[in-house]
A protein has these predicted regions:
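C-terminal auxiliary extensions adjacent to catalytic cores
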Residues: 366-385
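Conserved N-terminal helical subregion
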Residues: 2-9, 51-186, 190, 225-242, ...
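Flavin-binding catalytic cores
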Residues: 232-266, 321
C-alpha cells in the first residue's frame, strides 16, 4: 500500500467539530482550510458542557488543558423537581478525580475561540460557505457561496444540522421534530445559584437547566412541549418563560430576571434518524452533519469532538483517502448512532406531561443508585474511540 502522507483537507463549517478537526490535523502535520458561512464568529448566548469523554479526546490532541482553563468544572450534578426536591444526583467531582479527566462547562463562543487560536485563524475563511462539491476520484472540488471554488484531497462536511455537504452526499431528508422547543440564555451569576452546581429540573412537559460556566456567568436552557415553528414576539420571551418557570425553585426565577430579553435564543429541537453511511469517495461528514442528536445527553458537541480526533488520526495514517474514511466510519458510526437513539429516548422520558407517568418515572430514577449512573459515565469515558 502506498502511503499518502501529504494531503489538503477542506472543512465545511467552523463550529466545534470543524475547528477541532482543523486543530487535530494541524498537530498531525496535515494542511486544512475551514470555510464558514458566517462573516464573523460571534458570541452567541449559549453554553456547552465538554463531557469527560470529549475531554479525553481533546487530551489526545493537546487541547484539554487549554479548554479546561477557559471554563469551569462542576462539583455536583442533579436532576430535580420544580419544588427543588432531588430525583437523582451524580458525583461529578469525585468522578473527575477518579478518572483524572475534567468536565468543563464553558461558553460556546469561548470554546470556539480556544479552538480557533490553535487551528490558526489564517486557515479559516469567513463568509464563504461550501454549497456543493464534485469528486473526480483523484481530488474533490468544493463550490463556495461567493461563486468561487477550491480543490483539495478530502472534503469534510462539518456544517451542521442542515448540512449542504450532507445534502449533496446523501440527498435531502426531512428533519425529525422532537416535540419540544427550547430557549437558551446567559445570565450573570445570582446569589441564589450554588457555585459549581449543575442541575436539570423536570416539570410537566418542561425542563430547566442551570450550568455555571465561569467568568461570573451561568448558562441556562429551558424546554417546553410545543408544536414546531412557534415564535415569540419581540421582547416577550422572558415574560413567557417567567410565566412558565417563575414558580420553580431557586435560582431559576432569578436567572430569568437577570437575563436581557434580547439575549434569549429560541430553537426548535430536531434530529435525524441514524444512517449507515457518512462517506462516499473523498467526502465525509462529521458532528451534526453526520449524526444530529437532541441535546438531552449533552453529547452533540462532544461526539463532534470525538469524530474530529478519530478522523484526524485516520487521515494522518497515510492510508488512501477512501480507506481512511472507511476506518473513520468503522470506529465512530455505531457509537455516535447509539447516542442519537439514547438521547431521543431520554428526551421523550424527560418531557412527560402525565402526573402519573412523571410520578412513576421519578420514583424509578430514585431507585437507581448513583453508583450505577456513575458506572455508565465511566464506561462512556473509557470506551471513547
Amino acid at each position: 500500500m502506498i502511503l499518502e502522507t501529504s494531503r489538503h483537507v477542506l472543512i465545511a463549517g467552523a463550529g466545534i467539530g470543524g475547528l477541532t478537526l482543523a486543530c487535530a490535523l494541524r498537530r498531525a502535520g496535515l494542511t486544512a482550510t475551514v470555510f464558514e458561512r458566517a462573516d464573523a464568529l460571534r458570541w452567541v448566548g449559549a453554553g456547552i458542557t465538554v463531557q469527560m469523554n470529549a475531554a479525553v479526546a481533546l487530551r489526545r490532541i493537546g487541547l484539554c488543558d487549554a479548554v479546561a482553563a477557559a471554563g469551569a468544572s462542576p462539583t455536583d450534578s442533579a436532576i430535580l423537581q420544580p419544588s427543588g426536591a432531588t430525583i437523582t444526583r451524580l458525583p461529578v467531582q469525585q468522578m473527575q478525580q477518579e478518572l483524572g479527566t475534567p468536565m468543563v462547562c464553558i461558553h460556546r463562543a469561548r470554546l470556539q475561540s480556544v479552538l480557533l487560536e490553535h487551528a490558526g485563524p489564517e486557515h479559516v475563511r469567513l463568509g464563504r460557505a461550501v454549497t456543493g462539491f464534485k469528486d473526480d476520484g483523484h481530488q474533490v472540488t468544493a463550490t463556495l457561496s461567493d461563486g468561487s471554488s477550491v480543490t483539495g484531497d478530502v472534503l469534510v462536511g462539518a456544517d451542521g444540522l442542515r448540512s449542504a455537504v450532507r445534502s449533496g452526499l446523501l440527498g435531502d431528508a426531512p428533519l425529525r421534530y422532537s416535540g419540544y422547543t427550547s430557549w437558551r440564555g446567559i445570565s450573570p451569576e445570582v446569589p441564589s445559584a450554588r457555585p459549581g452546581h449543575v442541575s436539570e429540573t423536570w416539570g410537566p412537559g418542561a425542563r430547566f437547566g442551570v450550568v455555571p460556566i465561569g467568568s461570573g456567568q451561568v448558562y441556562w436552557y429551558a424546554t417546553l412541549n410545543a408544536p414546531p415553528g412557534g415564535q415569540d414576539t419581540p421582547g416577550a420571551a422572558r415574560t413567557r418563560l417567567r410565566e412558565i418557570f417563575g414558580g420553580w425553585h431557586a435560582p431559576i426565577p432569578d436567572l430569568l430576571a437577570a437575563t436581557p430579553d434580547d439575549a434569549i435564543v429560541r430553537t426548535d429541537i430536531h434530529d435525524r434518524p441514524p444512517v449507515n453511511r457518512w462517506s462516499r469517495g473523498r467526502v465525509t461528514l462529521l458532528g451534526d452533519a453526520a449524526h444530529p442528536m437532541t441535546p438531552n445527553l449533552g453529547q452533540g458537541g462532544c461526539q463532534a469532538i470525538e469524530d474530529a480526533v478519530v478522523l484526524s488520526e485516520c487521515l494522518a495514517s497515510g492510508a488512501p483517502v477512501e480507506a481512511a474514511l472507511a476506518t473513520y466510519e468503522q470506529r465512530r458510526r455505531e457509537r455516535a448512532n447509539q447516542m442519537v437513539s439514547r438521547s431521543w429516548r431520554l428526551g421523550q422520558l424527560a418531557q412527560l406531561e402525565s402526573p402519573t407517568a412523571r410520578f412513576m418515572r421519578d420514583a424509578l430514577f430514585r431507585l437507581v443508585p448513583s453508583s450505577l449512573a456513575a458506572r455508565g459515565v465511566r464506561d462512556l469515558v473509557r470506551s471513547a474511540a
